[in-house]
Amino acid sequence: MKNISEQKRKERGMTQQQLAAALGVSRQTIISLENGKYNPSILLAHAIARLFGTQIEDIFLFEEEEA
């Protein structure tokens, strides 16, 4: 799943470690998330959106898989 979490994090002047600490996850989770290799739980996605003051769908770009 594509997302703009890295862009939002940088706009706020946050490091990956600061974002991880604010969300209660590891820095590795943030790295994987920003690289599109990790799909967060709905709770984590909601926490990220809330932290950035936006909606989940504004951060995470859902793509339908081709059949």
Per-range role (PLM):
Residues 3-22:
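Short basic helix-loop element that most often maps to the first helix and adjoining turn
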Residues 45-49, 59:
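Hydrophobic micro-packing sites on short alpha-helices
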Residues 61-67:
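Short, charged recognition helix plus adjacent turn
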